[in-house]
Amino acid sequence: MEDDRVFSSVHSTVFKESESLEGKCDKIEGYDFNQGVDYPKLMRSMLTTGFQASNLGEAIDVVNQMLDWRLADETTVAEDCSEEEKNPSFRESVKCKIFLGFTSNLVSSGVRDTIRYLVQHHMVDVIVTTTGGVEEDLIKCLAPTFKGDFSLPGAYLRSKGLNRIGNLLVPNDNYCKFEDWIIPIFDEMLKEQKEENVLWTPSKLLARLGKEINNESSYLYWAYKMNIPVFCPGLTDGSLGDMLYFHSFRTSGLIIDVVQDIRAMNGEAVHANPKKTGMIILGGGLPKHHICNANMMRNGADYAVFINTGQEFDGSDSGARPDEAVSWGKIRGSAKTVKVYCDATIAFPLLVAETFATKRDQTCESKT
């Protein structure tokens, strides 16, 4: 009898009755390669694969929601809206405003070409990056970056005049070419400041550099052509800052006003209404915080996709999940959000393939 009682107790503990998840959650299923190699189906299977594959699948869904949204989708029309906002054709034309942020290492990598594609076809509306994210784009127009190895010894590379970015190598000569190219532009900017009272800001400087580089491989060139603002609040932190420093010894007086840019950046979010706003942020640090902070000015973004490998246990903004930004009012409580814990050089091209690129291909096909 005692054994029966113990068995019954243990059995009921181990085999506790489950709540049914049928119809509430997706079943975990991977891609079946018996059906052949179908890349769109493979990518769709990410949603039900689990772990970060599912997060990537969710990110694809969120970005597609950003791209599909129209003001006409909103069933309620605000009583105090303008007559234009009540017009059905106008409402159908209003799209989500997309902020894209990325760190410099991604421009050092081949992700630069993915970013250039998005800017070239005006698929994003506002860009925020670091100084390295600016100069690496320009320098690649002057000289290439090469693939090396993570394990190459620093002292050896230094003796050869080679700079390592992860497993990428940038010859020091590239920065010499950058100096030769950019210093005359600074001279001309200073002349325009003195003679024409031009007030330079970081974003105006970057537009000018995009114009001057005149190279279709550059995302800055396309941002200039498409009139997409590029913000870089940490302008002096990088080789571009070094060049400004060196230029100040040659001739002083060049002024770059960051206050005008914070007004412009925050204004991109504040004046977005009646549009929704979406954030796609690769990596952390300054671009992530700057975009989120601007969206706080409008009571939060409506969509957010973060792709980075940062962790939140150290309290860094870089590693924070979207929900932390909700607590600050940088993302709305009702927003569609996801963080993908993955190297963006892997995740972002796949995401673009299943979102921006697919939709552009579909649009082009419908026109032919």
Curated annotation (Swiss-Prot):
<dbReference type="GO" id="GO:0034038">
    <property type="term" value="F:deoxyhypusine synthase activity"/>
</dbReference>
<feature type="binding site">
    <location>
        <begin position="315"/>
        <end position="317"/>
    </location>
    <ligand>
        <name>spermidine</name>
    </ligand>
</feature>
<feature type="binding site">
    <location>
        <begin position="104"/>
        <end position="108"/>
    </location>
    <ligand>
        <name>NAD(+)</name>
    </ligand>
</feature>
<keyword id="KW-0808">Transferase</keyword>
<feature type="binding site">
    <location>
        <position position="237"/>
    </location>
    <ligand>
        <name>NAD(+)</name>
    </ligand>
</feature>
<dbReference type="Pfam" id="PF01916">
    <property type="entry name" value="DS"/>
</dbReference>
<dbReference type="InterPro" id="IPR002773">
    <property type="entry name" value="Deoxyhypusine_synthase"/>
</dbReference>
<protein>
    <recommendedName>
        <fullName>Deoxyhypusine synthase</fullName>
        <ecNumber>2.5.1.46</ecNumber>
    </recommendedName>
</protein>
<keyword id="KW-0520">NAD</keyword>
<feature type="active site" description="Nucleophile">
    <location>
        <position position="330"/>
    </location>
</feature>
<dbReference type="GO" id="GO:0009553">
    <property type="term" value="P:embryo sac development"/>
</dbReference>
<feature type="binding site">
    <location>
        <position position="136"/>
    </location>
    <ligand>
        <name>NAD(+)</name>
    </ligand>
</feature>
<feature type="binding site">
    <location>
        <begin position="324"/>
        <end position="330"/>
    </location>
    <ligand>
        <name>spermidine</name>
    </ligand>
</feature>
<dbReference type="InterPro" id="IPR036982">
    <property type="entry name" value="Deoxyhypusine_synthase_sf"/>
</dbReference>
<comment type="similarity">
    <text>Belongs to the deoxyhypusine synthase family.</text>
</comment>
<feature type="binding site">
    <location>
        <begin position="135"/>
        <end position="136"/>
    </location>
    <ligand>
        <name>spermidine</name>
    </ligand>
</feature>
<keyword id="KW-0386">Hypusine biosynthesis</keyword>
<comment type="pathway">
    <text>Protein modification; eIF5A hypusination.</text>
</comment>
<comment type="function">
    <text>Catalyzes the NAD-dependent oxidative cleavage of spermidine and the subsequent transfer of the butylamine moiety of spermidine to the epsilon-amino group of a specific lysine residue of the eIF-5A precursor protein to form the intermediate deoxyhypusine residue. Also able to produce homospermidine from putrescine.</text>
</comment>
<feature type="binding site">
    <location>
        <begin position="309"/>
        <end position="310"/>
    </location>
    <ligand>
        <name>NAD(+)</name>
    </ligand>
</feature>
<feature type="binding site">
    <location>
        <begin position="343"/>
        <end position="344"/>
    </location>
    <ligand>
        <name>NAD(+)</name>
    </ligand>
</feature>
<feature type="binding site">
    <location>
        <begin position="130"/>
        <end position="132"/>
    </location>
    <ligand>
        <name>NAD(+)</name>
    </ligand>
</feature>
<feature type="binding site">
    <location>
        <position position="242"/>
    </location>
    <ligand>
        <name>spermidine</name>
    </ligand>
</feature>
<feature type="binding site">
    <location>
        <position position="284"/>
    </location>
    <ligand>
        <name>NAD(+)</name>
    </ligand>
</feature>
<dbReference type="InterPro" id="IPR029035">
    <property type="entry name" value="DHS-like_NAD/FAD-binding_dom"/>
</dbReference>
<feature type="binding site">
    <location>
        <position position="289"/>
    </location>
    <ligand>
        <name>spermidine</name>
    </ligand>
</feature>
